[in-house]
Each structure stands twice: as C-alpha cells, then as structure tokens.
C-alpha cells in the first residue's frame, strides 16, 4: 500500500506533442486535484473559476504559467495560487513533458 496517489495517476500518461492528458487524483465533495501532463508545445488554455481557488503545483518540467495576463517560466517544483476569478493557464514550450496538478476548492 502507498499513500502517494500521484505516481499511479500519471504513470501511463504520455501525451504526444501538442497534446494534454489528464488524470483525477482526488475528487471529493469539497476539492478536486487533477494532474495535467503537457506534451511539448501543448497548453491548458487560459480560463477562470469564478467561485473557486485553483492552486497549480508544478511537479515536473518547465512550464510557462499564465495568470491575469502575467506569465512566468517555472522550473519544478513550484506553486502558483490562482485566486477566485483569476484567468489562468499553462503551456509547455520545451521538448520534454511538463506535469502540474491543479487543486480546486470549493467545488461548484
């Protein structure tokens, strides 16, 4: 038995260039934790959650994270809080995969 939910969730995710694959790590009535694996030149398009806070945890690679028009190229490990209503997204401009989780709470 392992307490780690991350390794098993992303083990089989291997997106092609330009593609994003996802896995739900935790889903409860209150919170969603979802893994995003970005292939080279892939993106999670900017979007917002009006009623929820979304926290990105960069776990692998070097994605560029966008929040409210500001962007930063990050290297794992990194954490980016996205408050309610913040327009946020991520893209991978490298030749390797990038992995981040998004923790969203409260759920609508």
Predicted ranges, named:
Residues 25, 35-37, 55, 79-81:
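Conserved hydrophobic/aromatic beta-strand scaffold that supports enzyme active sites
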Residues 1-34:
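A short, N-terminal "cap"/entry segment at the start of jelly-roll beta-barrel domains
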């Amino acid at each position: 038995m392992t307490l780690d939910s991350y390794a098993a969730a992303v083990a089989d995710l291997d997106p092609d260039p330009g593609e994003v694959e996802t896995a739900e790590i935790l889903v409860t009535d209150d919170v969603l934790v979802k893994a995003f694996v970005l292939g080279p030149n892939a993106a999670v398009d900017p979007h917002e959650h009006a009623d929820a806070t979304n926290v990105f945890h960069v776990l692998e690679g070097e994605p560029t994270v966008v929040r409210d028009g500001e962007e930063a190229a990050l290297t794992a490990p990194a954490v980016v809080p996205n408050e309610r209503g913040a327009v946020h997204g991520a893209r991978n401009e490298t030749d390797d995969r990038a992995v981040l989780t998004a923790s969203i709470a409260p759920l609508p």
